[in-house]
UniProtKB/Swiss-Prot annotation:
InterPro entries: DDH_dom, DHH_sf, DHHA2, DHHA2_dom_sf, Mn-dep_inorganic_PyrPase. Pfam families: DHH, DHHA2. Mn(2+) 2 binds at D13, D66, H88, D147. It comes from the Archaea. Gene3D superfamilies: DHHA2 domain, inorganic pyrophosphatase (n-terminal core). The keyword Protein biosynthesis does not apply. The keyword Cell inner membrane does not apply. The gene is ppaC. This is Manganese-dependent inorganic pyrophosphatase. It catalyses: diphosphate + H2O = 2 phosphate + H(+). The lineage of its organism: Archaea, Methanobacteriati, Methanobacteriota, Methanomada group, Methanococci. Mn(2+) 1 binds at H7, D11, D66. Signal peptide: none annotated.
Length: 307
C-alpha cells in the first residue's frame, strides 16, 4: 500500500499536506504521531477525519511531506520503499535510488501543493487532476496560516499570501485575518497541557556534524499560559538530553504578539552561544525577532557545529 505521511510530532502543515496530497495521488494519508490541539481544531472545523497512525514503513510505499530529515521520519524508513518527497525545508536524507523530489523555499508545504493545483500542474508529481474541494482547501489554508504564523514569520513569501487568498475563496473564508486568529488561538492553548505534551507538540531532531540536536517550539499568544510550567519543562528537557543522547536541546517559547522567542537551552550551551552570539544567563535567553525554527534557528546552529 502507498501512504503519504508527514514528520513525527506532526503539525497542521504535515497533516493537511498528507491528506490533500493523498487525495490527488489516490493513496492513503497517514501520520507519525498524535494530533495537536491546533490541528484537531482545523480538522473539526472542516469536518475531515484524522489520518491513520502508522509506526512502521516496512512493506509500504512511502511519500514524505513537510520533511526530509531521517531523524524526523520512520525509524525503519529503509524498510519501506521511498517514492517521493514534497517539502519546503532544506534537503535532508539521501537515497540509494532516484526518487521524485519537489520542494520550494516557501512558508509551508501546503503552499507548494496549492501552487501545483492552481497551475494545473499536479500531474508533475504523479497526481490526478481533480477539483479541490472546499474542505481540503480549508486544510491547506489553515496549514499556510499556521506555518507562517499568520504571515508574521520571516519564512513568509508572496506566494504563501497569494495561495492563501485563492484557497480562502474556495473554502468560503471571507476574512483570512479573523480566521487566522482562530487558528493561532487554538495553536496557543497550552494551559491545559502537561509539560511533556507541550514539549512534544512540535519537537524535531537534527544531526549536525554527527551530533544529535533537538529543537522544540511552542507558539503562544499569552506567554503566561506556559510561564508557570517552564521549570518542569526544563527538567524534562534535561532528562531527555541525558537519556536520549542529545548534545544540545533548544526549546523555543515563541511570543506571537511580541514577535520573538525565549530559548530554553539544555546541554551544549557554548555551541548555542557561538551560533547566536549571545550569552545564556541561567537556562534561557530571549531572541528578539526569532519566530522560525527553519529559517532562524536551524541554519546558525548547523553552521556552528560545522565550523
Amino acid at each position: 500500500m502507498r501512504y503519504v505521511v508527514g514528520h513525527k510530532n506532526p503539525d497542521t502543515d504535515s497533516i493537511a499536506s498528507a491528506i490533500v496530497l493523498a487525495y490527488f495521488l489516490d493513496c492513503y494519508p497517514a501520520r507519525l504521531g498524535d494530533i495537536n490541539p491546533e490541528t484537531e481544531f482545523v480538522l473539526r472545523k472542516f469536518g475531515v477525519m484524522e489520518p491513520e497512525l502508522i509506526e512502521s514503513a516496512k512493506g509500504k510505499e512511502i511519500i514524505l511531506v513537510d520533511h526530509s530529515e531521517k531523524s524526523q521520519s520512520f525509524d525503519d524508513l529503509e524498510e519501506g520503499k521511498l517514492i517521493a518527497i514534497i517539502d519546503h525545508h532544506k534537503v535532508g536524507l539521501t537515497t540509494t535510488e532516484p526518487i521524485l523530489y519537489y520542494a520550494k523555499p516557501v512558508g509551508s508545504t501546503a503552499t507548494v501543493i496549492a501552487e501545483l493545483y492552481f497551475k494545473d500542474a499536479i500531474d508533475l508529481i504523479g497526481g490526478k487532476k481533480k477539483e479541490l474541494k472546499p474542505d481540503l482547501a480549508g486544510l491547506l489554508l489553515s496549514a499556510i496560516i499556521s506555518d507562517t504564523v499568520l504571515f508574521k514569520s520571516p519564512t513568509t513569501t508572496d506566494l504563501d499570501k497569494e495561495m492563501a487568498k485563492k484557497l480562502a475563496e474556495i473554502a468560503g473564508i471571507s476574512n483570512i485575518e479573523e480566521f487566522g486568529m482562530e487558528i493561532l488561538k487554538a495553536k496557543s492553548v497550552v494551559g491545559k497541557l502537561k509539560p511533556e505534551e507541550i514539549i512534544n507538540m512540535d519537537f524535531k531532531n537534527f544531526d549536525f556534524n554527527g551530533k544529535k540536536v533537538g529543537i522544540g517550539q511552542v507558539e503562544v499568544i499569552d506567554v503566561s499560559e506556559v510561564e508557570s510550567k517552564k521549570e518542569d519543562i526544563y527538567k524534562l528537557l534535561e532528562e531527555k538530553l541525558k537519556n536520549e543522547g542529545y548534545d544540545l536541546i533548544v526549546f523555543l517559547i515563541t511570543d506571537i504578539m511580541k514577535e520573538g522567542s525565549e530559548a530554553l537551552v539544555v546541554g551544549n550551551k557554548e555551541m548555542f552561544e557561538k551560533a547566536f552570539n549571545v550569552k545564556v544567563e541561567g537556562n534561557s535567553v530571549f531572541l528578539e525577532g526569532v519566530m522560525s525554527r527553519k529559517k532562524q534557528v536551524v541554519p546558525p546552529l548547523e553552521r556552528a557545529y560545522n565550523g
